[in-house]
Amino acid sequence: MNKLVIILAVALIGFSSPAMAKKKTLKVSTELKGAETQKISFEVDKDGFIRIFDGKTTKGWRSYGKDYLAPRWTVDNGCLHFKRGQGEGGDIIFAHKFKNFILEMEWKIQEGGNSGIFYLGQEVARPDGGMEPIYISAPECQVLDNENHPDAKLGVDGNRKSSSLYDMIPAKPQNANPWGQWNKVRIVVKNGKVEHWQNDVKVLSYVLWTPEWTKMLQESKFSEKAWPAAFQLLNNCGGDKHEGLIGMQDHGDEVWFRNIRVKILK
């Protein structure tokens, strides 16, 4: 009887122990053009998603083209928060390249605010030693206060509103919550097929590396005539390996991101 009690007690301790939580090790690059050599462990939740932002630290994150995270990006009450004001800002990346994946997060933005979520991005240096913007190589899922930011009325058919593929495909239905409220985003990338979801509704889909993709680029601000470098990079989005970085945009406005997680697909 005593032996049975001991066995049950040990089993219960093991079942409830936080140490039993699943972990996933990802390799990240710590600097521009650096190899993904630094190993970092992240929690894997019950849905099989890797929580690439733990709500407490910025491990795995750095500024685009830098070896550090700019000080205007902070951890604030469980959120990754970009603050307006003085000091260095700029776009940021999670420094591991993903190929086939589901990316989920929630965001909210200030009144009249603008930001974006990038995927399959590359760090592209200019010959003069500066950096091209991340959106020269990465599709952008728009983050916007649709009611108060002028970009919502620009572009074509609402293709600059929240969760749109920026300047190419409008998110329909347009179901974004107002500024100051949380919106949920889900981006699915698998073998070139891409979906944007907003607040649990699929709002657009498209396929990379197809004649239709090239046509969309040619009809956008990223056309071969208007911006040859962007056209070349986006037309071969993800490079030869069809993989790239996840990033968030500093557009000068306060924005918060939380519950950032990724599921790697085969």
Protein language model regions, located:
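Positively charged n-region of N-terminal signal peptides that target proteins for export
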Residues: M1-L4
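Bacterial N-terminal signal peptides
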Residues: I7-G14
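Short, low-complexity, intrinsically disordered N-terminal modules
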Residues: S17-P18
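Carbohydrate-interacting regions of secretory-pathway proteins
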Residues: A21-K266
